[in-house]
Amino acid sequence: MSGDTGPPKQGGTRYGSISSPPSPEPQQAPPGGTYLSEKIPIPDTESGTFSLRKLWAFTGPGFLMSIAFLDPGNIESDLQAGAVAGFKLLWVLLWATVLGLLCQRLAARLGVVTGKDLGEVCHLYYPKVPRILLWLTIELAIVGSDMQEVIGTAIAFSLLSAGRIPLWGGVLITIVDAFFFLFLDNYGLRKLEAFFGFLITIMALTFGYEYVVAQPAQGALLQGLFLPSCPGCGQPELLQAVGIIGAIIMPHNIYLHSSLVKSREVDRSRRADIREANMYFLIEATIALSVSFLINLFVMAVFGQAFYKQTNQAAFNICANSSLQDYAPIFPRNNLTVAVDIYQGGVILGCLFGPAALYIWAVGLLAAGQSSTMTGTYAGQFVMEGFLKLRWSRFARVLLTRSCAILPTVLLAVFRDLRDLSGLNDLLNVLQSLLLPFAVLPILTFTSMPALMREFANGLVSKVITSSIMVLVCAVNLYFVISYVPSLPHPAYFSLVALLAAAYLGLTTYLVWTCLITQGATLLAHSSHQRFLYGLPEEDQEKGRTSG
């Protein structure tokens, strides 16, 4: 890939850009095959005018990306936020979705302008040690997300079978369904995208049904949505807000979206085509995330109405006096506030609104788990290929990710109870929030580089907004760690936490350092890090042109 160069030489080294290839030839997919094996052509229309035909051609990557906003981890976070805070945290959901859209916009822009995904660009610009550590953190995020999909699917099977399928059985079934989706991929890219659109529609209909039957108070709902306040809130509500952010803005999804947009044929030698692609991908992502926001809103509002300040005894009585009385014992007979999870959530909906509500909830939960399976597979494959240049088949990639996810999950399902399984879901949401800097910092760094992005580099407003997101996330994560450490069960855990915290802070500091270089702190650009100012050194430019 060729492009403009920065200053001809810096310290005897010539630097240059890898962006904007001179020809529109699409990159070839690796022999193992990926989502990018097929390229979608963009129809020719009158330049400078909006075209529904073109929007339809660009539609697909944004909806696949939006599935990460609707996985079982999000559903769990939504219902717990409703149960813990009622409608008070709806504004957090709204603004987390907006911030997520801003991050995904940067991811799509990087893929369109450079023709490379975030993992590939990280491989070219970061030294080996930070690059490997960064790859490991994103793999951890992918496995954590896959564990949530396994948990959600297993609970859905248990609810649909009235408990006849045990949790461990549901976990094992997810091994089969993960490979089933690989066969769907063989029917073509557009059909695969349409299938995931169908699953999103199922979620919208099922959770929308729950919203209609629950009839949440609209006045209080609108107040919670548009007034950013939380009167009477304490640490539980704040930790729940952290969970919402971690569930909505997922690290691996930023890497995923930067790859998905490469499935459209865009002539990167023409600035007008790049600008047009950026516009249509932004419109599509906005539509997709608006749909995901409504679905999350449905869930949070339903449980804010049905569960807020509900006691275990009250929940027991409701189920004991319903047609689902066999489920009543899952609620302890005490006056403590219900600690709801996605299993109990389905049960109480069935007790309140009839068995149909329980089964419809389970179908929506199943759709959430299944839709996330394939996108997680793609994210893992793209990240591995980008960072390490290891090109595995999707079969091998699914086997690796799902094996890592299933082992701890099935052990919990066999030897512990449902509450431990749901508690793991909560912990995984917080994990996603803790790992978020390892996606946001790189995407902010590279989309702010004129040597890489040319005139499509972030402007001042975009830099300020995205940097503010980063500061907010880091502050919230720091608060969580400070709040969590005193609750450790044994002093020996402090050493482990200290070691992990040191590694975490070290990698974060390095990423902040390189990010500051692209934001204008040129004095930090020593030695090999001048590439963050001027682009790749001459000896690395050929690698940049041929990689990917």
Curated annotation (Swiss-Prot):
Residues 1-55, 103-139, 185-193, 257-284, 367-397, 448-463, 514-548 are cytoplasmic. The keyword Flavoprotein does not apply. The keyword Ion transport applies. It holds the Pfam family Nramp. Residues 1-38 are annotated as: Disordered. Its main location: membrane. It is found in: Late endosome membrane; Lysosome membrane. It catalyses: Zn(2+)(in) + H(+)(out) = Zn(2+)(out) + H(+)(in); Fe(2+)(in) + H(+)(out) = Fe(2+)(out) + H(+)(in); Mn(2+)(in) + H(+)(out) = Mn(2+)(out) + H(+)(in). Glycans are attached at N321, N335. Keywords: Endosome, Glycoprotein, Ion transport, Iron, Iron transport, Lysosome, Membrane, Transmembrane, Transmembrane helix, Transport. GO terms for cellular component: late endosome membrane; lysosomal membrane; phagocytic vesicle membrane; plasma membrane. One of its GO terms (biological process) is manganese ion transport. Residues 74-82, 161-164, 215-237, 305-346, 416-426, 486-493 are extracellular. Belongs to the NRAMP family. Macrophage-specific antiporter that fluxes metal ions in either direction against a proton gradient. Localized to late endosomal lysosomal membranes, delivers bivalent cations from the cytosol into these acidic compartments where they may directly affect antimicrobial activity. Involved in iron metabolism and host natural resistance to infection with intracellular parasites. NCBIfam families: nramp, Nramp_1. This is Natural resistance-associated macrophage protein 1. The lineage of its organism: Eukaryota, Metazoa, Chordata, Craniata, Vertebrata.
